[in-house]
Structure formats: structure tokens, C-alpha cells
A protein has these predicted regions:
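Bacterial N-terminal signal peptides
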Residues: 4-16
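Extended ligand-binding groove/face enriched in aromatic
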Residues: 46-229
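N-terminal carbohydrate-binding accessory modules
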Residues: 26
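Boundary at the C-terminal end of the N-terminal hydrophobic targeting segment
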Residues: 16-23
Length: 229
């Protein structure tokens, strides 16, 4: 049994929206309390400084993104940290409770911390630092079957699996919500990244800045190819 990031909060948000629509008697307060309790647990106990991976053992002794993760790691690609941020903003809209907006701010600050100098995001980053992340790539990442990009540390950003885009969308929502200037600079940074990395034909590479240093099983490095997912 694993803790699935965001599922309890998402269910609560949906139920809360339904209660507002149908005015069910006596249940709204219970659901709101349960929803807040679950969110507080996810933010205070499950997250690492406001960042998430995908799955956790109930005792939090092990955790996974697309592969097993260190406790200090934060996963970007859905259903990782930006996905939780979107849920928190949805919960804020459903309830009007600033508790959820403040939790979303915490998630946004984590994403800003993990934004690469180029403006985008990798699949994952590590609060323990780049050397810790490189060590993970050299051990856990290299054991990945059919996960070629985890077998090599590029040090650049990815468009694959909505990595950079999911983080960018969430920061855009945070900025539009209250026009908080704290989100303007990182948002402009990722917009510049997106424009700079676009090919003249209109598509975008799997990863950027472009790298060609990881041919795999006799085939050329595909990370500069236009990506479709």
C-alpha cells in the first residue's frame, strides 16, 4: 500500500464542489475538515520542503517517482510537485480558504528553487545538491529498463512528459491569481526558455540546451529530436 500524492485532496475538492452545488446537509463541514487535515499531513509530513515525488510507503521510509527516489528529491513530471500545486489552487477556488493558497505558495517556491539556469526543469531535482543527484543517476538511474534518459545525467531541462510545461503552467496560474511579483521573474525566465528552444520548423526538442553526448545501444542521442509527448 502506498500513499498516492494528491488523491485525498483531489477527492475532497470534488466533493466540496458537489456540496456547494447541491447543499447536502451536515456533510460539508466534515468534508472540509477532512480535506484540510489530509492536506496538512501531505504538506507537513509527506512533502520535502513542499516538494513531492509520486508514491510513498505509509511510514515514509521509501518513495518513488518514475523510479525510486531519495527523500531529498522532488519530482516535476506529473503526477509530481506541479500537479499538487494545481490541486491546491483548485482547492482554494473550491473553498475560498487561504490555507490552500498558502500551501500552493510553498509548492511554487519549491519549483522556483529547482528551476534551472536555462529556465526549464529536469524531471527531478535534489535539495541535497547536484552531486547527490549525479550519484542517484549513477546508481538508481542506471538500473532503469527502457528509461534511457535516467541512465545519463544531462544537466539540462526536458519537455518530455510535461516536465517543464507542468511547472510553467502552475507558476502562470500563481502569477495570474494575485499578480504576485514574486512569480514574474521565474515565469519570464521559462517563457524565454520556451521561445529560445523552439526549432525554426515550429517544434521543440526533448531536452534543451541541446546535448549529443549519450548515444544508446548504437543509436544516436535522441534528446535533440522533436518530442511529441
Amino acid at each position: 500500500v502506498c500513499i498516492k500524492v494528491g488523491l485525498t485532496l483531489f477527492a475532497g475538492a470534488c466533493l466540496c464542489g458537489g456540496i456547494q452545488a447541491h447543499s447536502l446537509n451536515g456533510e460539508k463541514e466534515d468534508i472540509l475538515n477532512t480535506m484540510k487535515s489530509a492536506t496538512r499531513y501531505m504538506m507537513d509530513s509527506v512533502s520535502y520542503r513542499g516538494g513531492f515525488v509520486w508514491n510513498y510507503l505509509p511510514d515514509l521510509s521509501r518513495s518513488w517517482g518514475e523510479m525510486e527516489a531519495k527523500r531529498t528529491m522532488v519530482w516535476i513530471q506529473p503526477p509530481g510537485t506541479p500537479s499538487v500545486g494545481h490541486l491546491l489552487l483548485d482547492a482554494y477556488h473550491a473553498t475560498g480558504d487561504k490555507f490552500y493558497y498558502e500551501a500552493a505558495e510553498k509548492v511554487a517556491n519549491v519549483l522556483i528553487w529547482g528551476q534551472l539556469e536555462c529556465g526549464g526543469w529536469n524531471y527531478v531535482f535534489d535539495f541535497a545538491g547536484e552531486n547527490s543527484l549525479k550519484e542517484w543517476y549513477e546508481t538508481v538511474g542506471k538500473s532503469g529498463w527502457r528509461l534511457e534518459e535516467f541512465r545519463h545525467y544531462y544537466g539540462n531541462a526536458t519537455y518530455d512528459d510535461l516536465g517543464t510545461i507542468s511547472a510553467a503552467k502552475f507558476l502562470l496560474r500563481m502569477y495570474v491569481e494575485k499578480n504576485d511579483p514574486a512569480y514574474k521573474a521565474p515565469l519570464e525566465k521559462v517563457i524565454h526558455f520556451i521561445l529560445e528552444s523552439q526549432y525554426p520548423v515550429g517544434g521543440w526538442p526533448q531536452r534543451y540546451p541541446l546535448r549529443y553526448d549519450h548515444p544508446f545501444e548504437g543509436k544516436e542521442d535522441y534528446s535533440s529530436f522533436i518530442t511529441l509527448n
